[in-house]
């Protein structure tokens, strides 16, 4: 027996979300169908449309914003001499939750992953060149997965190529972060220690 095309399309749509398989997608779909108060569905639909129509990337760092410049880049109270390079928007969310880092960010839009054909040129590296003039420190904050380490190494080489001032520090989050673990699963203390104890990350021969 087949469901209606509308139901099947919604089930298929839910499977696009990370970690959502067919059974979970079916559960979500029939939960919505069984809602007596259809306003809940309309509420969800409204905010999904707003997400599509209102959210874009910051012209400077690539973080999510509803304006051309995000709240971090436009905040004069932030430390504009420090940039933390992260893979995606969720990483920024993790660091902001601990309220321990007060510099700026640069979002790459992913990690280098040759198995998925994600190369350096597919990520947001080029716009980083324009941000190096007034910087004193750049923190490379990719996770400790294989892809994260490859991206960190490439980031270091990229920065060394374009940095004219050798006094600018290139640092990396301290080890102690479990290998292969996403920032989203780390507690506040671990993240704070990783920032506080970050290491010099200039080059193999230095």
Curated annotation (Swiss-Prot):
The keyword Protease does not apply. Residues 81-178 form the Toprim domain. Keywords: DNA damage, DNA recombination, DNA repair, Metal-binding, Zinc, Zinc-finger. GO terms for biological process: DNA recombination; DNA repair. It comes from Phytoplasma mali (strain AT). InterPro entries: DNA_Rcmb_RecR, Rcmb_RecR, Rcmb_RecR_Znf, TOPRIM_dom, TOPRIM_RecR. This is Recombination protein RecR. Coiled coil: none annotated.
């Amino acid at each position: 027996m087949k469901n209606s095309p509308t139901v099947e399309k919604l089930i298929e749509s839910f499977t696009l979300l990370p970690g959502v398989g067919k059974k979970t997608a079916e559960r979500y779909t029939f939960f919505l169908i069984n809602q007596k108060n259809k306003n809940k569905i309309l509420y969800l639909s409204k905010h999904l449309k707003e997400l599509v129509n209102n959210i874009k990337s910051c012209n400077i760092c690539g973080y999510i914003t509803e304006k051309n410049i995000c709240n971090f880049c436009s905040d004069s109270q932030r430390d504009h001499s420090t940039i933390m390079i992260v893979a995606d928007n969720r990483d920024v969310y993790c660091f902001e939750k601990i309220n321990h880092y007060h510099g700026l960010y640069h979002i790459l839009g992913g990690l280098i992953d040759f198995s998925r054909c994600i190369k350096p040129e597919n990520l947001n590296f080029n716009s980083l060149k324009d941000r190096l003039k007034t910087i004193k420190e750049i923190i490379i904050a990719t996770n400790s997965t294989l892809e994260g380490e490859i991206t960190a190494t490439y980031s270091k080489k990229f920065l060394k190529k374009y940095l004219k001032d050798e006094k600018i520090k290139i640092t990396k989050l301290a080890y102690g972060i479990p290998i292969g673990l996403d920032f989203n699963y780390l507690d506040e203390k671990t993240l704070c220690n990783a920032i506080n104890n970050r290491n010099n990350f200039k080059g193999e021969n230095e």
